[in-house]
Amino acid sequence: MKNVTDSFVSLGHWPSAGSFGFNTDILATNPINLSVVLGVLIFFGKGVLSDLLDNRKQRILNTIRNSEELREGAIERLEKARARLRKVEKEAEDYIVNGYQEIEREKLNLRNSIGKNLERLENYKNETIQFEQQRAINQVRQRVFQQALQGALGTLNSCLNNELHLRTISANIGMFGAMKEITD
């Protein structure tokens, strides 16, 4: 504390002008010494400070240039990615549309195929029914004919004697012979 008070006391006292030198006591220096020190600092420090500032400026400019290049590269990659995305979205949309169209086509083909199969089955069923009806009719006719024939033979056998029987057979043979000649 004593040094601080001594420094303030020495401010009021001017040293004698016997020699030129630097006073290292900052509080005891006069404005001329301060201006000389500041002038020397500015003269010599200006180049160093200017170099430091120029280096810093160059580093900042290089960083900005690199950032700009990186930004441009990122923008370019982003545009390429967007273009690929649009292309992929379009392809996906085309696949979806084509898929739906294919599904509709397959449904239509399936419906047509089912319709044709049903129609064939219906025709087969109708043909089978007709065939079975015709067969049943033929069986009924054959039974009716056999029964009628047996009934007629029974009636003829009971009603006819041998001579009448032989004449009827001869007449029938003659009729069948005439029919055969007509058909030939």
Swiss-Prot record:
Membrane association type: Single-pass membrane protein
Keyword set, alphabetical order: ATP synthesis, CF(0), Chloroplast, Hydrogen ion transport, Ion transport, Membrane, Plastid, Thylakoid, Transmembrane, Transmembrane helix, Transport
Transmembrane feature ranges: 27-49
Protein name: ATP synthase subunit b, chloroplastic
GO cellular component: chloroplast thylakoid membrane; proton-transporting ATP synthase complex
Note: In plastids the F-type ATPase is also known as CF(1)CF(0).
Family matches, as Pfam families: ATP-synt_B (PF00430)
InterPro entries on file: ATP_synth_b/b'su_bac/chlpt
Family that this chain belongs to: Belongs to the ATPase B chain family.
Cellular compartments annotated: Plastid, Chloroplast thylakoid membrane
Biological function: F(1)F(0) ATP synthase produces ATP from ADP in the presence of a proton or sodium gradient. F-type ATPases consist of two structural domains, F(1) containing the extramembraneous catalytic core and F(0) containing the membrane proton channel, linked together by a central stalk and a peripheral stalk. During catalysis, ATP synthesis in the catalytic domain of F(1) is coupled via a rotary mechanism of the central stalk subunits to proton translocation.
Superkingdom of this protein's organism: Eukaryota
GO molecular function, one term: proton-transporting ATP synthase activity, rotational mechanism
Quaternary assembly: F-type ATPases have 2 components, F(1) - the catalytic core - and F(0) - the membrane proton channel. F(1) has five subunits: alpha(3), beta(3), gamma(1), delta(1), epsilon(1). F(0) has four main subunits: a(1), b(1), b'(1) and c(10-14). The alpha and beta chains form an alternating ring which encloses part of the gamma chain. F(1) is attached to F(0) by a central stalk formed by the gamma and epsilon chains, while a peripheral stalk is formed by the delta, b and b' chains.
